[in-house]
Amino acid sequence: FTAREDDEILISISFEAPSGGYAYEKQKRKIGDYATAAAGVIIKVENNKCSSASIALTNLSDTPVYCDKAVDIIVGKEIDKNLLDQVTKACVDQSDPVADQRGPVEFKKYVAGIVIKKALNRAIERS
């Protein structure tokens, strides 16, 4: 919602740039093709604990999916393989892909798990 009137235009938006590591991973069949699954992650890690995170998926639902349940799982916790497995599962569980020419639902959920894990690990390395 905005309070902009019909005779007004938006000329700028200001917000604090996120800090930490970031990654965007996708799986596609060929160059120029739409991704079968994609994940974007921004994460801040301090003393091996996640202090903030944002995780989103594309091409795994009718609209992009913000993985709020996964963020709730990871923030404040020490990063380890078990935690990343839980976060990945929470993301996949929030996805709602449909079968199409890029594959059946089961395949898309499998691929989603791979791209989510890759994005998480890359973002953590960059944090």
Regions found by a protein language model. Give the residues of each.
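C-terminal structural segment of proteins
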Residues: 1-127
